[in-house]
């Protein structure tokens, strides 16, 4: 056992896409800072960022219907869709900067062009999709989107989905070719490979046991070296907790006022994966449907082409599951251990409020393989049971907190940064849109935690991310220029791959 304190400038907890992004930004902005990373698992990007543990959608609201809500008068509120799209553009720009600067290579290993489509059935839903298409088409971020309710067009766009369909129920789809499939696991590993060349100390199989404030205002992180069994103590001026579902328990250990009255509810995801390559080759898009009435936002069904290890795959889901673990590799005591005197009422209030979610999860857990196949056949009528296996994806911990709008124990479905008033420590909580908006979220961490540095850093940030602080919606020419240039750098504008 070692009680020696080892000092550093920055500690990043968790080797996922968020820590990888923050570390990469900091190494460009403050190259002299010493950074240490602690990860419980044996390598980077193995939990939520792993390619099998998330949907791999470059979330930019091109096809996700839950980002566009219908108002009482039938008009469509696109504000959330615009926000998510603007945030994804920041990620695209930063990734393109890294590729252009040769800090990471071979972008086709982590991002591929792929049409994003929305698909609905029923007269009311067709009208909703048409209204959505018309509202989004007025915005430059969504240019190139097409709408069709003509069966012949749908057969061309969606051959696998339309084959064997006997229902006369009206159907419609939108299609936009500027969508992407992102392998966040591969990207995370690339970023940590780059950070290693910049002398960032990567410590795998190191579990953070405690975080506490020292008398001189630093943060002391107690770390268990799982290789040697030793306990280490590291201190830093700034700590980022980017441990996915494991972030909430660590945030609670800090004791900062901002960590109080926050709870977490874990939801696990399952996907069906097609093992018949002939079927896989018949589909080429991410196709998002509409969540069923009463189902939570994370239940939106989608049929996705994926590129994993440079091989085409086909996944359908998600189906929800329940586990009290906050991480896929976590403990069954995670949920009960997160209940504290300061959040127990918040958690209980959520339990009463969210009976619909509880009922939904119970129904999902009880589904047999054949019942899941029935849901899949709503997308692929001719789907055969023997062609599909189930894979368990990652855990997502939905944030529960008290809000002015929702009252006590309100379930949050977004991604949220919680930081100390003095900016010395920050944690990332929540789920979707998550990894797609990593650059936006980590810029938010910089703004909250290093406000005195932002004027000094602004020039470099704008070199890396040209639309930082600018609305692309209000600057369509800039959007077009950046979309074209980042697309060229990332190999998204043409079919051939980019090697550099």
From Swiss-Prot:
Keywords: FAD, Flavoprotein, Oxidoreductase, Tricarboxylic acid cycle. Pfam families: Mqo. Pathway: Carbohydrate metabolism; tricarboxylic acid cycle; oxaloacetate from (S)-malate (quinone route): step 1/1. HAMAP family: MQO. InterPro entries: FAD/NAD-bd_sf, MQO. It catalyses: (S)-malate + a quinone = a quinol + oxaloacetate. One of its GO terms (molecular function) is L-malate dehydrogenase (quinone) activity. This is Probable malate:quinone oxidoreductase. The gene is mqo. Belongs to the MQO family. Its EC number is 1.1.5.4. It comes from Bacillus cereus (strain ATCC 10987 / NRS 248). The lineage of its organism: Bacteria, Bacillati, Bacillota, Bacilli, Bacillales.
